[in-house]
């Protein structure tokens, strides 16, 4: 899928990620995305990974997670993401349960947790570290950094093997095992095949006609979450630019920097947005506060009491709504960072009625 999109879009930006040292968003083109996936796929062969084996990804959301995913799929491998906040004991359980041989880790926390578990995981052979700033344990003689891993695939020395494996790939192949967070007992693995994703993409192609390759999606939820993982695959399939938010706590900042048209999230995100707006209104006084309260009232009447049930709003109500749309609503959306919004899928729990009405 990535290689096909590279042929179509070339040097158009496919991914962006935030460089925390420079505070700049770094673009990755479709060509670079494809090239890195090919290199990583060759590197996996160089490591001796056999078809239909399990590899793990223990990291925050990073471009390397996607590089590794698609490189694995090219080799008919199964990727198993671990929550970035998993303890050493939780990581150990999943590594042993899935018999993971190679584990890709993000930053210092994940490396430390994984290395602590290493001696208790008999299948585990090597850690591959995304972040070059990670300090290795003095006892560690086997781990390598991701750039060293990619160097194993430089000039694509095993491309014939990769292409042979890709040719043998089937929708019946296992794509991921997604483990639950383990908050109510031992984590449980959910097996997802490629046909699961293919069918999800097929039906979304039919239903989400408003989604185009002009859209920009904020990757906010962890890629260990099936909602975000499937959504990101859909975005890649549709040629949507994906901007990767590394640290969940930073979303209020990054969403204002990117101002996405798309973002999947959970109700809790919108609850926080709603609470923030209510707090802002409470701090206002006089005419400004009265206008904000009236704008919310007008919006609810216009969209919920009339449009949602197929009625035409009265002219005066419609004119007030249009006025607020260019003033109060525009200000609130810009303050949040969603003024360019196309749509924002939300799942995981029911969204409270007052939040739905507000949004």
Question: Whereabouts are the PLM-identified features?
Answer:
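Conserved AMP-binding/adenylate-forming core of the ANL superfamily
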Residues: 11, 15-70, 87-92, 145-150, ...
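Conserved AMP-binding A3 loop
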Residues: 27-31, 168, 175-201
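Conserved ATP-dependent adenylate/AMP-binding module captured primarily in the ANL superfamily
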Residues: 86-119, 200-217, 248-262, 335-337
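Conserved S/T- and glycine-rich ATP-binding loop of Class I adenylate-forming
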Residues: 55, 72, 103, 174, ...
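Structural core segment of the AMP-binding/adenylate-forming
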Residues: 74-152
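Conserved pre-ATP/AMP-binding loop-to-beta segment of ANL
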Residues: 10-13, 129, 144, 154-179, ...
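Conserved AMP-binding/adenylation subdomain of ANL enzymes
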Residues: 198-216, 223-329, 340
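A short helix-loop-beta submotif of the ANL/AMP-binding
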Residues: 41, 53-54, 60-80, 84-88, ...
């Amino acid at each position: 899928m990535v290689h096909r999109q590279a042929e179509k879009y070339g040097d158009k930006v496919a991914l962006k990620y935030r460089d925390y040292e420079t505070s700049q968003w770094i673009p990755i083109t479709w060509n670079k995305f494809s090239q890195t996936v090919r290199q990583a796929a060759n590197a996996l062969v160089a490591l001796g990974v056999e078809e239909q084996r399990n590899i793990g990804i223990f990291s925050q959301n990073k471009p390397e997670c996607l590089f590794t995913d698609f490189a694995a799929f090219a080799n008919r491998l199964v990727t198993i993401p671990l929550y970035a906040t998993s303890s050493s004991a939780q990581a150990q359980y999943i590594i042993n349960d899935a018999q993971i041989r190679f584990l890709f880790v993000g930053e210092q926390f994940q490396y430390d947790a994984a290395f602590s578990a290493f001696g208790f995981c008999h299948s585990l052979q090597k850690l591959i570290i995304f972040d070059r700033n990670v300090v290795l344990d003095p006892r560690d003689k086997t781990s390598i950094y991701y750039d060293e891993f990619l160097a194993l695939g430089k000039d694509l020395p095993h491309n014939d093997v990769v292409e042979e494996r890709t040719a043998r790939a089937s929708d019946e192949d296992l794509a991921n095992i997604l483990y639950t967070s383990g908050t109510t007992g031992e984590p449980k693995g959910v097996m997802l095949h490629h046909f699961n994703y293919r069918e999800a993409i097929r039906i979304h192609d039919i239903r989400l006609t408003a989604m185009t390759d002009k859209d920009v999606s904020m990757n906010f939820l962890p890629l260990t979450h099936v909602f975000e993982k499937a959504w990101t695959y859909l975005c890649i399939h549709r040629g949507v630019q994906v901007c990767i938010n590394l640290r969940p706590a930073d979303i209020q900042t990054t969403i204002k920097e990117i101002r996405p048209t798309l973002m999947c999230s959970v109700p809790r995100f919108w609850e926080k947005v709603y609470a923030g707006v209510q707090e802002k209104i409470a701090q206002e006084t006089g005419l400004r506060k009265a206008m904000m309260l009236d704008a919310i009232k007008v919006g609810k009447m216009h969209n919920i009491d009339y449009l949602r049930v197929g009625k035409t709003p009265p002219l005066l109500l419609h004119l007030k709504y249009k006025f607020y749309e260019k003033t109060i609503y525009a200000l609130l959306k810009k303050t949040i960072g969603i003024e360019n919004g196309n749509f924002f899928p939300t799942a995981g729990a029911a969204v409270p009625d007052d939040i739905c009405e507000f949004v």
